UniProtKB/Swiss-Prot annotation:
Cellular compartments annotated: Cytoplasm
One Pfam short name: HSP20
Organism the protein comes from: Zea mays (Maize)
Major place of residence: cytoplasm
Record keyword Cytoplasm present: yes
Signal peptide (residue range): none
InterPro entries noted in UniProt: A-crystallin/Hsp20_dom (IPR002068), HSP20-like_chaperone (IPR008978), Small_HSP (IPR031107)
Annotated protein name in UniProt: 17.8 kDa class II heat shock protein
Keyword terms, alphabetized: Cytoplasm, Stress response
Domain sHSP as annotated: residue spans: 48-164
Domain of life per record: Eukaryota
Molecular-function annotations in GO: unfolded protein binding
Length: 164
């Protein structure tokens, strides 16, 4: 999508867009392609970095849980995915696709964000990854991760002293 379309054609925006654009050819100028797929790892990284930067979120610690509140405007429950990776990384992602165009309609301005939404959060050690719940209401996703109960303090072990 072009910055001109949004009225953001400035030298700064052009420079930023140029830095974020990834060519479709080899991954590097020397043709160093470690992925074997034309630099797709680089494109994936840039796409994911853009998605993470554009997805606002709040993290709250509650008495018995952690709450992750993520804006996911225009996404339905079928478009949102919540996963726990590597046993300690909470991944919230989704994708908003362009609506079907009407033949007789012409966009004069498109400001709503299309594309991928994603955030990754490293969970604290006391988070119970088996007790994760997610609710989406009015474009706001709330993921709740319960805390593990605090470990009980160890009681001192009494050793019987025998008289010899």
């Amino acid at each position: 999508m072009d910055a001109v379309m949004f009225g953001l054609e400035t030298p700064l925006m052009a420079a930023l867009q140029h830095l974020l654009d990834v060519p479709d050819g080899d991954a590097g100028a020397g043709g160093d392609n470690k992925t074997g797929s034309g630099g797709s790892a680089t494109r994936t990284y840039v796409r994911d970095a853009r998605a993470m930067a554009a997805t606002p979120a709040d993290v709250k610690e509650l008495p018995g849980a952690y709450a992750f509140v993520v804006d996911m405007p225009g996404l339905g429950t079928g478009d949102i995915r919540v996963q726990v990776e590597d046993e300690r990384v909470l991944v919230v992602s989704g994708e908003r696709r362009r609506e079907e165009r009407e033949d007789d309609a012409k966009y004069l301005r498109m400001e709503r964000r299309m594309g991928k939404f994603m955030r990754k959060f490293v969970l604290p050690d006391n988070a119970d990854v088996d007790k994760v719940a997610a609710v989406c209401r009015d474009g706001v996703l709330t993921v709740t991760v319960e805390k593990l109960p605090p470990p009980e303090p160890k009681k001192p072990k009494t050793i019987e002293v025998k008289v010899a």
